[in-house]
UniProtKB/Swiss-Prot annotation:
It is found in: Cytoplasm; Nucleus; Cell membrane. This is Copine-7. Its main location: cytoplasm. Changing D33N: Does not inhibit calcium-dependent translocation to the cell membrane. It comes from Rattus norvegicus (Rat). Residues 305-504 form the VWFA domain. Changing D168N: Inhibits strongly calcium-dependent translocation to the cell membrane. Inhibits strongly calcium-dependent translocation to the cell membrane. Leads to the constitutive (calcium-independent) attachment to the cell membrane.
Amino acid sequence: MSGDSERTVAPGVVPAPCASKVELRLSCRHLLDRDPLTKSDPSVVLLQQAQGQWLQVDRTEVVKSSLHPVFSKVFTMDYYFEEVQKLRFEVYDTHGPSGLSCQDDDFLGGMECTLGQIVAQKKMTRPLLLRFGRNAGKSTITVIAEDISGNNGYVELSFQARKLDDKDLFSKSDPFLELYRVNDDGSEQLVYRTEVVKNNLNPVWEPFKVSLNSLCSCEETRPLKCLVWDYDSRGKHDFIGDFTTTFAEMQKAFEEEQAQWDCVNAKYKQKKRNYKNSGVVILADLKLHRVHSFLDYIMGGCQIHCTVAIDFTASNGDPRNSCSLHHINPYQPNEYLRALVAVGEVCQDYDSDKRFSALGFGARIPPKYEVSHDFAINFNPEDDECEGIQGVVEAYQNCLPRVQLYGPTNVAPIISKVARMAAAEERTGEASQYYILLILTDGVVTDMSDTREAIVRASHLPMSVIIVGVGNADFTDMQILDGDDGILRSPRGEPALRDIVQFVPFRELKNASPAALAKCVLAEVPKQVVEYYSHKDLPPRSLGGQTGEAGPSSAP
């Protein structure tokens, strides 16, 4: 186990649909003490293996001067039952602010396992190992996993306090608050730790968000415990007081504008006859949010409208030649048809009229045979929609002998066209229609600057762009459009609001079944739909039943 493991950005990997999400909570015991005058200031780095290399995923906060830290930072991960997801936890004595770099930090030990092992055990404790597999003394790390797939809510809380006890001789207390959930076995699980407010007996702590699952295991009557401490830089925090409540009590008290609790120190209460409290803790704000799922929106009546855009540039080869990517063989569908049918048959189940807009680009089209980068392949500019995916297939096959393959490979016009439809939908202020643009192309786009600009604008709209690269061209430059490796920016430097592009080289999936192909190509769409409507704060139109006829009869 090495503390200086090489970390690289994982290349774009097409994920499979995830079975569930899990939260990981960490704590350590008996850490090595690397500081000569004080105790270690530990933090934990989480890494995940991707294609044989370790990718740094996240890092906990630093717990000052502690050899037995309990971290409040929660790692949320997608759990794939069918994959071996290798994880590495590395513990460091942190010098300076907790960032992504561990270069100047002292390695205290690490542990490798799989996410499946953690999930299966729910609570896993392992020894920490130094380099070459040596034990790091008696150091251990404990990882607790919780499934949050069924939870669709979170709460925003804001606490403040008044007239806290002064624990410092020459200044006022430096208070912070810890919120714990009481488990069924009586143990206490740290939910959140606030920041420290320096030199203040009437602190106002920053608001924070926490899932209902984390807060109370989605049981509103589960006991919660709040403790207030006076911060000590050496880790010997002074206890000010605590109180016990429930989330149900919090909500009721907040609604009645009586959300405050005596902060009580039990030792003082026993010793002092007139003791009342060590201050008062006030719940200044409580906001309960529901996080809607992809199926919430679909079952609420949101339609998925699919537009197909096909590359008719000359680099595909003469369709009359059997080597052409556009060659029609009645016994062996070409790559365009395979990708088109696999994706289209899934998408049409989410659109009540099952009509697809079918467009082409990069060809000379009749009657004047001028180059067009946005034409209806049914040659009806007034209505470019086809009946079902089979209608698109027929229009494609009928179109081939009527056009002259030409170029260049410009896709920005079609992205902008679909974006205009999505913009009209956005103005309705409802979660009623989401647009998917499926672009099938045999090469790198030639209008990259315009395409980046169009995608950045489209990232603000209810739409996603899926690009399938057919053939054996070098598609390396296309990865820039997929935001997995960083934030896509327009030529002017404007960042995309969200990642809406999924690029898939067909050759990596050509031996996959149509169902597997569709799952890979559409893997990111549910997340993108939820991200858009969540950002706009738009709930599903109807949670009680569907307003349209479409339904998830074949969920991707």
